A protein has these predicted regions:
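Non-cytosolic head/periplasmic domains of membrane-anchored proteins
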Residues: 41-150
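Repeated scaffold domains used in trafficking and secretory/extracellular systems
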Residues: 5-16, 44-56, 84-95, 129-139, ...
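Extracytoplasmic/periplasmic/luminal assembly and interaction segments
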Residues: 6-56, 62-63, 259
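Blade-level signature of beta-propeller repeat domains, shared across WD40, Kelch, NHL, RCC1
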Residues: 297, 302, 306-337
Length: 337
């Protein structure tokens, strides 16, 4: 129903930043509103940018580099100099950043206040392989109070994973290293940990999904085991979705949808080679550059159709019937009848 021409440089990635459009590449980042109006841009030099988004705040760092830019829709909030090579990072909605850093003798997890320019961490954690394992995934809660870490280690020849929670608020102050709860899992790897909101988190391993509840000391509330190969994990504050290769041969993929309490509420088969899956309000939006399928949370089709030109990003809006589309040369608005 509307289109605005924009110039998008080749090799630029696009992400939804709380309804605005974040563009980033090796050379810099910029932000536009959903009507195509430029809000800010920041140039930098990165070899392989890594991005974390929480609500309206994002952190951009360079894998193996030492700089992290913390931004929101209004521009740069602060720049962090880590002094050690960055392996991964996670930002909270309040601009606090957890960064996994490579030190020659150990791996460090440092937490920074990214709301100003800093090279001083507010929390230092030194991790050694023989004691706690290697941190393969880190996530901050939206309010920045809890950090969730998945560790992996070999224990006398067998694989072991451990999920730990650290509380940087009053509850964690009296605990050693702010550690408030943790769980061990044998013979599995947990490469994905994520907060859905401030009191619900989940983890996906190669054979299960685990839900945790609690805004101070998270505890396990539900676990579901699976046999099939995990292809992707998607979530919002209310739902989590895991995509598998479909073993039955009926379709290419299978999407299992879970509520925040860890109940599996729906399974749907997917034949589309999708580029992203978005949970928005009570909808599931599955799309690639050419086509789009929108269902309700229980899989009933609300819309199935094709785009007029290739789409790199679909943006849900406040209306459940209106979506922004970023193409190679425009930002369009699509409205469902």
């Amino acid at each position: 129903i509307a289109t605005v021409p924009v110039t998008i440089v080749q090799g630029t990635k696009t992400e939804d930043l709380d309804g605005n459009i974040l563009f980033y590449s090796k050379d810099g980042a910029s932000c536009m509103d959903n009507k195509g109006k430029a809000i800010w841009n920041q140039s930098y030099e990165m070899q392989s940018p890594i991005l974390s988004i929480s609500g309206a705040v994002c952190a951009l760092g360079d894998y193996n580099g030492r700089e992290i830019y913390v931004c929101d829709k209004n521009g740069i909030r602060g720049t962090i100099n880590t002094n050690l090579p960055i392996r991964s990072l996670s930002v909270a909605e309040n601009g606090v950043v957890a960064a996994v850093l490579d030190d020659s003798s150990a791996t460090r997890i440092n937490v920074y206040n990214g709301n100003s320019n800093t090279d001083e961490a507010i929390v230092h954690a030194k991790v050694s392989m023989d004691k706690s394992g290697y941190p393969i995934s880190v996530c901050m809660s939206p309010n920045g109070r809890i950090m969730m870490v998945s560790y992996f280690f070999m224990d006398s020849g067998s694989m072991k994973s451990s999920i730990a929670f650290y509380n940087f608020g009053e509850v964690g102050e009296n605990q050693t290293d702010n550690y408030v709860s943790g769980y061990d899992y044998l013979n599995t790897v947990v490469p994905y940990v994520q907060f859905m909101n401030n009191s619900v988190a989940f983890a996906v391993s190669d054979d299960r999904i685990i839900f945790f509840s609690g805004s101070e000391k998270p505890t396990v509330v539900a676990t579901s085991l699976f046999d099939d190969e995990v292809i992707g994990v998607y979530h919002n504050s209310d739902y989590a979705g895991v995509v598998f290769r479909d073993a039955t041969g009926e379709a290419s993929y299978r999407l299992d949808v879970y509520s925040a309490s860890g109940n599996k509420i729906h399974t749907q088969l997917l034949d589309m080679e999708y580029s992203d899956i978005i949970f928005h309000k009570e909808q599931v939006i599955i799309y690639n550059s050419e086509s789009c399928q929108i269902t309700n949370i229980r899989g009933a089709d609300k819309f199935v159709g094709s785009f007029e030109k290739p789409v790199s990003l679909l943006l849900p809006t406040a209306s459940a019937y209106r979506y922004g589309l970023v193409t190679g040369d425009s930002i369009d608005v699509m409205e469902l009848n």
